[in-house]
Amino acid sequence: MGIGSEMLHKPGTDHVSILLSIAIALLMLFSLTLGRYPVPFADVARIVFTTFPINAVGDYENAPWVVVEIVRMPRILLVTLCGMGLAMSGAAMQGVFRNPLVGPEIAGVSSGAALGGVAAIMLSWPPLAIVGLAFGSGLGALAAAFALARLTGRASTLALVLSGVIVGGFCGSLVGLLQTLADPLVKLPSIVYWLLGSFAGATYEKVAVVAGVTLFAGAALLALRWRINLLSLGETDAAALGANVEALRWGLMGLVALLVAAQVSVSGGVGWVGLIVPHLARMLVGPEHTRLLPTSACLGGIYLLAMDDIARSATEQEIPIGLLTSAVGAPIFAFLFWKTQSKGWMRE
């Protein structure tokens, strides 16, 4: 199969990323108005455009300024970055494995990061230490999956997938064990809430961590977008066109692991974003990754930010965002699967 018309972008997609970028900026401003302490949109715009970049000395006696700059701004930035990273990861993984059912959690990174986060909570470590251990554990899970795949003698797609399932299952069992051993009055509620996913603990330090990882890994994925297109054609065709399939696949999975580990480390479990958002982006711009990756990033930021707005504004008590992304994502994915099942992954 050659790079046919399906690999070309759809008509009118040149402006999609621009429109989505404008939409995400407006949604971020609107999100700053939401919450238990309402702040009018005009006040939000004034605060943002007069104090950004963030001043070292702020007006801490001004309640709206504190709410917007100190409480809501880091959360909204963190949510947006995580949504963008997860969506780009999902789009890349679906291209690498030529399978629309693949998500960025396939290598066991999410479970590994969850194990690190739970262990840090059990040890009463401070928030940034939880982020660090969760991030390191996620990368450790990826290394374990790679090593296990190597034991098969051939790093095939199937070996990588099965290795990720094995490592993820093992890490999940350890998480369950730690929950069983946790103090039911103090530690267990914190662990359960963290695993369900929440951005309530967002800080500018966490934003800096995720921003650094997202900029690095996202830029690397964009630089490799043409190579991902080759992998989407299949291993044989990609190799015939000059791609080092094994090295490229492993490198891409490493970049995805960085993004997923960064997200889990700051917010706990947030699923379905990397699975459904690339499908929506593909419906807008087609499967060609030079447009699919940036479009997925914008849609991912919009989707997760909208879910977080609902999570913190719909009820008196904040809803764990992982519950919302699952509750909304599952029926959306079911609809997309029904809509596209007869069309296949890539049309001839």
Model-assigned labels for residue ranges:
Residues 2-348:
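Alpha-helical transmembrane segments in inner-membrane proteins
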